[in-house]
Amino acid sequence: MARTEGDTWDLGSSVGATATSVAANRAFASRSTAGGPEPLLNDPYADLLVEAVGLPHFIRVARGEIDFDDDPLFGARQMLEQITVRTRHFDDFFAGAMAAGPPKIRQAVILASGLDTRAYRLPWPAGTVVYEIDQPTVIEFKTAVLADAGVAPTAERRTVGIDLREDWPAALRGAGFDPTRPTAWIAEGLLIYLPPDAQDRLLDHITALSAPGSRLATEHMDAKALTGEWARAMTERARRHGSDVNLSELFYSGPRTSATEHLRAQGWQTEVLSSNDAYQAQGFAPVADHLVAMIGDSGYLTARLD
């Protein structure tokens, strides 16, 4: 179903299903060594959450029961490498942000947190508060599943159940967020699901809430990746393997100001890590040529507000 203004979802539909898909991929990478001595990732809770959502396709992905090896677009190796690079990149961002300073950063915000498990699995410094923002039903589901399994956060976790199209800055402050203290923000896999004007507003809100020393990590999207071709190709791939998630209906394609340019105009110091450099930083070969042709210079954006 195509996106509409004010639409809602759960973890089995629309944008919510993409959160389940990402968690399934993390679970798959957490049980795959790809020929090495250790699993590619260590997310002990992704599988638990995917099983609780209960969608058969994503359960099979998480268990490694689907053969992606011969897919012409994105085989199992590329799939495992992509989720490994992405997850490690944002994990490393938080680790680096917490180690930086002065001033020390001791509050983190995960926007559109979905089935993100970082508040439960990263070794946060003492005194860190992690805020998770997402739709109320998504927040409630994850909280309940992990609590029922006896899993406790590794930092003080505060949840903010609100749609990012609503007044989430007020809700965040109401949960105890202190805009006078530096913050580490991540918007992982989020911007492509926002209309161009909503992306700009989100970045403006982040800027308004960020004290000097704050840091932000998100994706950098090349214009080539916003034409809709990438979404169509990934939708066709999903259907080949039994999923009915239609990314063509979920992405907002077309012209937009890049997050990098927008943040620079707001006074942030920005750095873009290309996909190839991100892969090589994690010990993988460069991205396949046919994928580069579709995603262009897309990669990872980090920013610092001095």
Curated annotation (Swiss-Prot):
One of its GO terms (molecular function) is methyltransferase activity. Keywords: Methyltransferase, S-adenosyl-L-methionine, Transferase. It is an enzyme of class 2 (transferase). GO terms for biological process: methylation. Its EC number is 2.1.1.-. Signal peptide: none annotated. Pfam families: LCM. Belongs to the UPF0677 family. Exhibits S-adenosyl-L-methionine-dependent methyltransferase activity. This is Putative S-adenosyl-L-methionine-dependent methyltransferase Mvan_1345. It comes from Mycolicibacterium vanbaalenii (strain DSM 7251 / JCM 13017 / BCRC 16820 / KCTC 9966 / NRRL B-24157 / PYR-1) (Mycobacterium vanbaalenii).
